[in-house]
Swiss-Prot record:
GO terms for cellular component: nucleus. Residues 126-153, 183-203, 243-259 have a biased composition (Polar residues). This is Hypermethylated in cancer 2 protein. Residues 24-87 form the BTB domain. Belongs to the krueppel C2H2-type zinc-finger protein family. Hic subfamily. Transcriptional repressor. Its main location: nucleus. It comes from Danio rerio. It is found in: Nucleus. Residues 296-308 have a biased composition (Basic and acidic residues). A zinc finger (C2H2-type) spans 387-409, 450-472, 478-500, 506-528, 534-556. One of its GO terms (molecular function) is DNA-binding transcription factor activity, RNA polymerase II-specific.
Length: 560
């Protein structure tokens, strides 16, 4: 005893959660575009992601292998099992999808792209001769075979049996749409009277084929709700009546298997709205108006991002019928929304120091701008402007325009001196060593054997010296994709990006406060335990955190 559509309903809910950013625990960065997702979904779909998400919550993808628009389609396929391409499934789009699928080790998507590229009729243009098996191509059979009224009546009978199933759900592959569209176009060009007689059958499918093929600016894949039992079953009588019908319907079992094994689905509402009215004249006029209205829109918005597309009224209605429509940005808006926000003492330092206000000495005493990741509900998509300038919040359609815009900012705006998560513990230890060195030089209580060759500062161990020497390096090959700040190590850059994205995986069991770094949590726990491991060698003062000791040591070294 089971629910037939339980899996699809569950996947639909997960996709809606992804669109709203609910319970998303991983960020995928593609150039400057950020996509939120769930680790368990990615791990179940991709071997590549499965090996990465165990170690980090932030994943940077190779921009030579995948771009933001292609990865959005990949992510939609992972969450829905459907491909709704804004390029009408062109060769270029499938090649890009195949490259990305192979790179991310999505074997089902890669196999689907290979089959589609193999089936594409454009590959036959390079072969003017007939195929090796002696049969003419499907396109040639469709365009050269005349259609008789008897054939149309058979199609009309089969259409009646299918209407009831379409009212429930209907999944059509791209091959079905192409075959039916071509079949009806041939019928109208060869026999106008035939199209009138069979308007309920073939012309209905012509409207269906036109409507679906023109629907390049697709809506939300997260809102389409499809039952697995809705795969249309073709009538054997209609499939065997004529050569033209066999040309259209012989492909259906194959495409149905392709749809079942490698989902490439379309929602039920799209088929319901495209059913022709009984009146033939009214049907013709409405179809002409629909063509005139949709043709410029589909051309004007070709290549536009799916979530920001203003769909025709008919398509919007279909999506509402198919499922609950998400607000403004339906395609699982995977991009992260940011808000520039000024706070005192950084993301976590201000909270920690407020907890320890009785003993903590506020070393900075300054306002620093931090970029705070805001995940409050669902916000409108950025549309074409995938590349966002974090300091001012402006979006740009290309990375070149973003880079040109970033150069207009002053250095102070982009490289804000803030108490970064990466500065401690190693860099703070270096500063503490420097201050202690000055103190010991005055009091003569300790000797340092390891000296810096650049500034002659000395340290008591080589590890601290190496960390100090990195501050003199001029090359910083790892930039932050969000603010542009440069780092000498990849791990340091990754930890820095957590401050932008608001990823705080470490939580205090006592009070629930969350932190981006493990050592921050360890320091915070001392507030509850009362431990003070950092002691001043001059006056014996003890502190819970090392930065408080640094502030205290400055008092001893200051001229006053």
């Amino acid at each position: 005893m089971e629910l037939p559509n339980h899996a699809k309903q569950l996947l639909l809910q997960l996709n809606q959660q992804r669109a709203k950013g609910y319970l998303c625990d991983v960020i995928i960065v593609v150039e400057n575009a950020l996509f939120r997702a769930h680790k368990n979904i990615l791990a179940a779909s991709s071997i590549y992601f499965k090996s990465l998400i165990l170690h980090d919550n932030l994943i940077n993808l190779d921009t030579d292998m995948v771009n933001p628009s292609v990865f959005r389609q990949v992510l939609d396929f992972i969450y829905t099992g459907k491909l709704l391409s804004s390029d009408q499934f062109s060769d270029h789009n499938f090649n890009a999808l195949l490259t990305a699928a192979s790179y991310l080790q999505l074997h089902d998507l890669a196999a689907l792209c290979r089959k589609k590229l193999k089936r594409n009729g454009r590959s036959l243009l390079n072969k003017p001769t007939t195929p090796t098996n002696g049969r003419t191509s499907r396109n040639q059979r469709l365009s050269s075979t005349p259609v008789t009224p008897n054939q149309m009546s058979g199609l009309k009978d089969s259409e009646k049996t299918k209407r009831h199933e379409e009212l429930i759900k209907d999944d059509l592959s791209e091959d079905e749409m192409f075959a039916r569209n071509t079949h009806c176009t041939t019928s109208n060009s060869l026999s106008p009277s035939t199209s009138k007689n069979g308007s309920n059958g073939s012309c209905g499918m012509q409207e269906l084929g036109l409507d679906l093929s023109k629907k390049s600016p697709s809506g939300s894949t997260a809102t389409e709700e499809v039952s697995p039992s809705s795969i249309p079953q073709e009538s054997p009588q209609s499939a065997s009546e004529s050569t033209a019908n066999s040309a259209s319907f012989d492909e259906n079992p194959n495409t149905q298997n392709l749809t079942a094994g490698e989902p490439m689905e379309l929602g039920v509402g799209e088929c319901e709205e495209s059913q022709p009215p009984p009146d033939v004249d009214q049907h013709k006029s409405s179809r002409q108006v629909t063509r005139q209205r949709r043709q410029p829109k589909s051309e004007g918005k070709k290549g536009e991002d799916m979530e920001r597309v203003t769909l025709p009224n008919g398509v919007s209605k279909r999506l509402k019928v198919a499922g609950e429509r998400l607000p403004a940005g339906g395609n699982g808006n995977s991009e992260v929304s940011f808000q520039c926000k000024d706070e005192e003492e950084g993301l976590e330092n201000g909270q920690e120091q407020s907890e320890e206000s009785g003993q903590s000495e506020n070393e900075g005493g300054r306002n620093s701008a931090n970029y705070v990741y805001r995940q409050e509900g669902f916000e409108p998509a950025l549309g074409d402007n995938l590349y966002v300038c974090i300091p001012c919040g402006k979006g740009f359609p290309s990375s070149e325009e973003l880079n040109a815009h970033v150069e207009t900012h002053t250095e102070e705006e982009l490289y804000i001196k803030e108490e970064d998560d990466d500065s401690y513990p190693k860099e703070d230890e270096v500063e503490a060593e420097d201050l202690s060195s000055q103190i010991t030089q005055v009091h003569g209580t300790e000797t340092r054997r390891f000296s810096c060759s650049v500034c002659n500062k000395s340290y008591k161990d080589p590890a601290t010296l190496r960390q100090h020497e990195k501050t003199h390096w001029l090359t910083r090959p790892f930039p932050c994709n969000i603010c542009g700040k440069m780092f000498t190590q990849r791990g340091t850059m990754t930890r820095h990006m957590r401050s932008h994205l608001g990823l705080k995986p470490f939580a205090c069991e006592e009070c629930g406060m969350r932190f981006t770094r493990q050592y921050r949590l360890t320091e915070h726990m001392r507030v509850h335990s009362g431990e003070k491991p950092y002691e001043c060698q001059l006056c014996g003062g003890k502190f819970t955190q090392q930065r408080n000791l640094i502030s205290h040591l400055r008092m001893h070294t200051s001229p006053s």
